[in-house]
Amino acid sequence: MRHLIVLPLVLLTSSYKLFAQSFTFADTANFWLNELKAATKANQSLWNKDLYSPILLVNPVDRKVYANEPDSAGILKKQGPIFYGSLPTSVNISNTALEWSGKRWAMVMLPMPEEKANRLNLLTHELFHRAQPELGFVAYNPNNPHLDTRDGRIYLRMELEALKNAIAATDMKRRLQHVRHALIYRLERFQKFPGSDTTENQLELNEGICEFNGLLMSGRSDAEIREHLTARIDQFALSPSFVRSFAYETTPVYGWLLSSIDRGWNQRINASTDLTQFFIKAFGLQIDRPTIDQEAWQATPLYNGEEISRQETERETARQLLLNQYKKQFVESVHLQLPLINMNMSFDYTKMVVLEPYGTVYPVIRITDKWGTLEASKGVLISNKWDSATVSLPLQTAGNKISGDGWTLELNPGYTIEKDDVSNKFTVKPFLHP
């Protein structure tokens, strides 16, 4: 079974010196876990369930792990109030939910955010990932390549600008007008990119609802939530890729705004809910599809549409140059192709680049599979069918370790690299004894 693990990579700082003494950090971790336990208990009415459950706090530098429960295999040993051990190298480290050592866990990378609200937001986001199957949700992970195009990004940014105005509005009539405009820009996007309504909805039902849960369990006041969401939208506009990251921004805003007039709305949704239509109905809006083009155009000056269009046109020029570079690197030049069989991967979801019709380039990624472990910092092309990973030409080989420009591969026993002179590429294959 293939497992997709997504994460924004965390910049590790000298703060890890604080964690040098494991006993001291065990007390710190226990403090965070007690904070978390109190927050989930106080908010159990959100889903009629206390989400506190097995969780791993992992140091990606040395793979040390701190947990609130023992694992079934006895890898984690009790150390004061918590459990402590080392995570095997076969397990990719990220913010996610996973099955490991006999249990289903939430996993969160260290270091923790310094502010309590941000810390609880992150931890409860991942606890919701762990609880998704129990709550009737599915961890959909579709890409949304249209959100890497000029028009797709413009419509999404216009939607978010309208939502930002809705956050700031104190008058309910004005707030609903901005929400209406946001949903109109969304419907315009769906109309321009057929099928995007399905793929966007799937990611919002996964990451979007997780982030909504984190927001409401963060302990922020309404004023702090307004400030937090507004800052997030402004920061998101600078993100290099919207393909997988948009749902972290859209769904929490709609969800928080709706909670002010319909608390408990989230208990009426499931894995098959069309969130766009749900929001239109829940907000009491009437949107006439034949007139949305005109309404979207008329509302554009309210949301800085001209400047957004200018910025995205400029970005598109730079994107085309990057796509040409990636096409030469991964398609036209000699390269190494690895089959994806039973893959686990961790990557930075804010930097993905869609390279149609070949797949998606992940600039920073770690992949484990039957053949071994691949780590790359200058890009890996994952095919659209999720059946292969491509890196640039192999340059050095030392035993089972192979490397190229910006990547290293450690092969497991029984696998080797062969060159195919016909297709002008190298491939990883099982080693066949004569």
For the regions a language model picked out, list residue spans one by one.
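Short pre-active-site segment immediately N-terminal to the catalytic Zn-binding motif
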Residues: 108-123
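Catalytic zinc-binding patch centered on the HExxH motif and its immediate surroundings
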Residues: 83-102
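Active-site recognition of the HExxH zinc-binding catalytic motif
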Residues: 121-134
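N-terminal mature-domain "stem" immediately C-terminal to a signal peptide or N-terminal signal-anchor/transmembrane
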Residues: 21-79, 210
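Active-site-proximal alpha-helical
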Residues: 194-224, 233-290
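Post-HExxH zinc-binding segment in Zn-dependent metallohydrolases
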Residues: 134-190, 196, 200-226
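Bacterial Sec-dependent N-terminal signal peptides
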Residues: 1-24
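Non-catalytic terminal regions of proteins
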Residues: 270-434
